[in-house]
Amino acid sequence: MGACLTLSFSCDEVVNQISQGLCINVGYICELSKNVVAMKKDMEVLKKKRDDVKRRVDIEEFTRRRERLSQVQGWLTNVSTVENKFNELLTTNDAELQRLCLFGFCSKNVKMSYLYGKRVVLMLKEIESLSSQGDFDTVTLATPIARIEEMPIQPTIVGQETMLERVWTRLTEDGDEIVGLYGMGGVGKTTLLTRINNKFSEKCSGFGVVIWVVVSKSPDIHRIQGDIGKRLDLGGEEWDNVNENQRALDIYNVLGKQKFVLLLDDIWEKVNLEVLGVPYPSRQNGCKVVFTTRSRDVCGRMRVDDPMEVSCLEPNEAWELFQMKVGENTLKGHPDIPELARKVAGKCCGLPLALNVIGETMACKRMVQEWRNAIDVLSSYAAEFPGMEQILPILKYSYDNLNKEQVKPCFLYCSLFPEDYRMEKERLIDYWICEGFIDENESRERALSQGYEIIGILVRACLLLEEAINKEQVKMHDVVREMALWIASDLGEHKERCIVQVGVGLREVPKVKNWSSVRRMSLMENEIEILSGSPECLELTTLFLQKNDSLLHISDEFFRCIPMLVVLDLSGNSSLRKLPNQISKLVSLRYLDLSWTYIKRLPVGLQELKKLRYLRLDYMKRLKSISGISNISSLRKLQLLQSKMSLDMSLVEELQLLEHLEVLNISIKSSLVVEKLLNAPRLVKCLQILVLRGVQEESSGVLTLPDMDNLNKVIIRKCGMCEIKIERKTLSLSSNRSPKTQFLHNLSTVHISSCDGLKDLTWLLFAPNLTSLEVLDSELVEGIINQEKAMTMSGIIPFQKLESLRLHNLAMLRSIYWQPLSFPCLKTIHITKCPELRKLPLDSEIAIRDEELVIKYQEEEWLERVEWDNEATRLRFLPFFKFFGPEWQVSYVR
C-alpha cells in the first residue's frame, strides 16, 4: 500500500483557473440555480401582465368597436414566442441542475452547464425587457366604422327576387327617401330587409354606413339609440349613461356628416327619427330609411304615401319552398305522398312561416297515413297540428296590437266563414251591428262609417285582405283564420265556445257535450238534412247554416231553447220550403236571412219577433207573400231583390207603417208601384238598391226620379221607358242658389240592359260618385251623355269617380261624351259590338291613371276604325287596348 498525497486548494480557484483557461463566464454555472429561480419568477410576472393586457384588448375590441395597436399585438406575439422558449428551457432544467457539483459551483460537464446557463441568463434578460415594454397607456385604437355588417340568412329563399329588385330600384333609382314594407306576420318582411342589408355589401352604393335596428313592439328609445350608437362607435359604459337628448345630439353629429341607410325592422308604431337623433332623409342629404311593419297605418304615420306590400308566395313558389323543407327522400317515400304534400302545402296559402314550420314538421313523415292525418288535422282544427305553437303566437301579435277593443270581436267574427270566403263588407257590418259590436242606437250612416273604419283597420293591419277586383268584399287568409279560431276558443282551452265546422260534409248537427257553453256556431256549406231536437243553447248568439242544400226540415222544437240567438242565417238552403212557427221563440233575434230558399210564405210567428232589425229575402223564387211585415215594428233594413214576389201596392202601404225603417233594397215590376213608391218620401229616403225589371211605362214613357240621397245601386232591365229624368222641383232655382247638381251623390253602380226605348243617360250627370256603369243590349242608345241636354246644366263634369265602363251590343251608340274627359279614376273600359262608336273621350293631355288602364275590345275591325284627335293621343292610349276573342262572354247582373 503506497503512501497518500494530500492536496489542499479551494473550489473557486479551480473554477477560476478553468474559466481563465477557457475564457468563459463562470457565473453561467455558479449562478445557474439562482438564475433559474429568477427566470421562473419573472416569467410568471410577464404572463400575468400579458393576461391583463390581453383582457383589456378583448374587452375594448368586443364592446367598443376598437382594434388593438400594432405594438400591442407585436408585444403579445413576442411574449408568446418567449413563453415557448421558456417552456423549452424548462424541459431540461432538472437534468442540468443535477449536472452541477461542489454545491453548485462546478459541473460534471462544464461545457453543457455553461451553454445552458448562458441560455437562462439571456432568457432572463429577454423576459425583463419584455416586461418593461408591457406597460401600455392605451392598447387599442378606434377603428373606422364598417360600411355594412352582413347579416346571416338562410340559404334557401324562394320568391323574393322581384320584390327585392323593386325595393332596390326605389332606393337607388326612384329617389324615395323612406320606403315602407308592410305585410302580414310570417310573410318574409325581415328576410327581405336582411337581403336588402346584404345587397349593400355587394353594390357600390355610395353610402357611408348601413345601420340595422330591430325595433319591435313598444319601441325603447334608449335601446334603439344604443344600437345605433354601437354601430357608430359611440357606445361605451360612459355613453350608455348619457341622457337621451345628448345621445340624440351625438348620433346627429355623426350621421349628419355622411350618407346613411337606416333599416328598422318590425315597427308597430311611428318611430320619431328626430327623437333618436337621426337626420330626416331628403333628396339633399341622400339618406334613406327602410322599415318593415305589419300595419299600413304605420306606413302612413311614417309619411310613406306609397308603401310596398310583401305578399304571400304564389302557389308554384309555395310548393317549391315546401319541397325544400320536406326533402326529396320523404317526398319519394311513397307514390301518394307528393299529391298529399301539395294539399298540405295548400293549407299554408303561401305564407312562408307556415310553409317552413309545417314543411319541417313533415320532413320525417314517410307513411301515407301520417300525411292524410296532417290534412285532416289542418282541415278540422289546425291549432292542434304540431308546430302551430311556432306560428299562431307570432300571428297573434297583430291581434294584440289592435288598439280598439271594439275591433277585436269584429275580427274574430270573420273566422266563422269558410276558408277563402269573400265577405261582403256591408253584410259583415250588419252582422256586427246586430251582435252589438257597433252601437245600434247610432244612425245608420254613423254605424256604417264605424263598420267601414273597423274593416279599414283590419285591412291595414293585414288581418283582412281586400279583394282586388271587388272592393266591396274582404276575405281572411287561411292561417290568420286558424289563429282567429284559436283565440276565439280561449287559445284552445274552450273549443265548444265557438264551433266552426264548415264544408266538412256534415249530415246532422254535430254532437256537443255542453250546449250551454256554445256562443257561436257556423255549419255553413254542409249536407245537413234535418234540424231536430231541442238543444238548450242558452248562450248561443250566432247560428250560420248557409248553403246546406240538403236541408229540408226544421222541427218545431229546434228554436225553443235558444233565447239569446241574435243572428240566424239560413240563406242558400235551396231545399228549405218552410219555417216553423216556433221561430217566435227567438225573442232576441235581430238578423234573419232567408235568401235563396224555396220558402213560399213567412211564418206568422215571425211577426212576434219584436227585436228583428234586419230581414233579407233575396232570390226567393217561390215567395208569394210577406203580408203582415208591418207588425215587425223594429225592422230597420228590408232586402227583397229578385224574388218571385216583388214590391206591390199593398206592400208599399205596409212599408210606410215601419217607423224605424232605414234601408230598403227592393225589386219592382210595375210602373204603378214605381210611381207610388217614388211618391212616398219616407220610403224614397230609405232606398239603397233599386231594381226595375220589366217595367213598362203606361203614360209618358218617362221615368222621373226624385232626390234619393241614399241610393247606391240602380239596375234597370227590360224596361220600356224612353227617358230617365230628374224631378223638376229638384232642379228649381231659389232666389239665391243655383240648381242642385248632386242629388244622387251616393249612387255608385248603374246597370242598364235590354232597355230598347232609351236614347241617352244624361241623368247620370247628377251622380258625381258613380264608379261602375254598364249599358248593354239597348239598341236605341245613341250617346251616354247628350250634348244638347247637358249644355243646360253648365259646370258639371261627369265620371270623375268612374272606375269601370262596360258598353255591349249598342248598335246606335256614337258617343260617350262629345269632348275629352279627365277620367282620374278609370281602370277598365269594355267595348263590344258597338260598331258606330268611333271615338273615345280621351286626350293625350289628360292626367288619367294610365298605369292601371285597360281598354278591352272584341273586334279587330272596330279598333281599326277608331278615330283619334291627334297622333299623340293614339300613341298614348293604343298600348292599353287588349283584345278579347269570341270566347269572352258578357256577364249580366241578376
UniProtKB/Swiss-Prot annotation:
The keyword Ribonucleoprotein does not apply. This is Disease resistance protein SUMM2. Changing D478V: Constitutively active protein that induces pathogen-independent hypersensitive response. GO terms for molecular function: ADP binding; ATP binding. LRR repeats lie at residues 517-538, 539-561, 564-586, 588-610, 611-633, 634-656, 660-681. Interacts with PAT1. ATP binds at G183, M184, G185, G186, V187, G188, K189, T190. The gene is SUMM2. Transmembrane segments: none annotated. Changing L255S: In summ2-1; suppresses the extreme dwarfism and autoimmune phenotype of the double mutant mkk1 and mkk2. Disease resistance protein that mediates defense responses against the bacterial pathogen Pseudomonas syringae pv tomato strain DC3000, and the virulent oomycete Hyaloperonospora arabidopsidis isolate Noco2. Becomes active when the MEKK1-MKK1-MKK2-MPK4 kinase cascade is disrupted by the microbial effector hopAI1. Does not seem to be required for the activation of MPK4 by flg22, or flg22-induced up-regulation of PAD3. Functions downstream of MEKK2/SUMM1 in immune responses, including cell death and defense responses. Keywords: ATP-binding, Coiled coil, Leucine-rich repeat, Nucleotide-binding, Plant defense, Repeat. The keyword ATP-binding applies. Residues 31-71 form a coiled coil. Belongs to the disease resistance NB-LRR family. Signal peptide: none annotated. Residues 140-443 form the NB-ARC domain. InterPro entries: Apaf_helical, LRR_dom_sf, LRR_R13L4/SHOC2-like, NB-ARC, P-loop_NTPase, Plant_NBS-LRR, WH-like_DNA-bd_sf. The LRR repeats probably act as specificity determinant of pathogen recognition. GO terms for biological process: defense response. Negatively regulated by the MEKK1-MKK1-MKK2-MPK4 kinase cascade.
